[in-house]
UniProtKB/Swiss-Prot annotation:
CDD domains: RPI_A. It comes from the Bacteria. The gene is rpiA. Pathway: Carbohydrate degradation; pentose phosphate pathway; D-ribose 5-phosphate from D-ribulose 5-phosphate (non-oxidative stage): step 1/1. Catalyzes the reversible conversion of ribose-5-phosphate to ribulose 5-phosphate. InterPro entries: NagB/RpiA_transferase-like, Ribose5P_isomerase_typA_subgr, Ribose5P_isomerase_type_A. Substrate binds at T28, G29, S30, T31, D81, G82, A83, D84, K94, G95, G96, G97, K121. It catalyses: aldehydo-D-ribose 5-phosphate = D-ribulose 5-phosphate. Keywords: Isomerase. NCBIfam families: PRK00702.1, rpiA. This is Ribose-5-phosphate isomerase A. It comes from Aeromonas hydrophila subsp. hydrophila (strain ATCC 7966 / DSM 30187 / BCRC 13018 / CCUG 14551 / JCM 1027 / KCTC 2358 / NCIMB 9240 / NCTC 8049). Homodimer. Gene3D superfamilies: 3.30.70.260, 3.40.50.1360.
């Protein structure tokens, strides 16, 4: 089974967590694209979706699925999204696709967070994948200096502007053993919008696509 086939298996497995008649929270990325394809097969059974990115919104609308603004609703039964890395306690690094802020907002609203990944995303210690930090453009260099004081090596993701109009710093060289603590530390730096650590709001269920099928954790 190829990596993309494992992603597809995880994406389709998430369908069983979709509650008929509700609005579904939808994340961003290649694995989520498979979930959107699956969701389209039951589009008449759901009320619609809330999306964490422009790209996912366009894909959902392409299937005729109604996409709501998050401000129009007060609850989400489920949010389905991928991860760039996830550890054994379901702390995650997300934001490789630069949608981390909207992803974190939608995840906060949802009753249940379903993380869909292939088996290359599981790690013992977070940090091999660079940690994205979304920053206000004028604060980029200040935030970078503060991150260096914490032991990280921030690299500006040049040419990338988030859906919110901000910049991304990818922080390398950190073995993250206290994800909750670092999430708070980074968010406390003035000029930071948010960072890609999902530790305070981690996944409730993890669906892992493997060569032998989907594992649920």
């Amino acid at each position: 089974m190829t990596q993309d086939e494992m992603k597809k298996a995880a994406g389709w497995a998430a369908l069983k967590y979709v509650v008929p008649g509700t609005i579904v929270g939808v994340g961003t990325g290649s694995t989520v694209n498979h979930f959107i394809d699956a969701l389209a097969t039951m589009k008449d059974e759901i009320k619609g979706a809330v999306s964490s990115s422009v790209a996912s919104t366009e894909r959902l609308k392409g299937f005729g699925i109604t996409v709501y603004d998050l401000n129009e609703i007060d609850a989400l039964s489920v949010y389905v999204d991928g991860a760039d890395e996830i550890n054994g306690t379901r702390d995650m690094i997300k934001g490789g696709g630069a949608a981390l802020t909207r992803e974190k907002i939608v995840a906060a609203v949802a009753d249940k967070f379903i993380c869909i990944i292939d088996n290359t995303k599981t790690v013992d210690v977070l940090g091999t994948f660079p940690l994205p930090v979304e920053v206000i453009p004028m604060a980029r260099e200040y935030v970078a200096r503060e991150i260096r004081k914490l032991g990280g090596n921030p690299v500006w993701r040049e040419g990338v502007v988030t859906d919110n109009g901000n910049h991304i710093l990818d922080v390398k060289g950190m073995a993250i053993t206290d994800a909750k603590g670092l999430e708070v530390q980074l968010n406390a730096i003035v000029g930071t919008v948010t960072n890609g650590l999902f530790a305070h709001r981690g996944a409730d269920v993890v669906l892992i696509g493997t060569p032998d099928g989907v594992i649920t954790q």
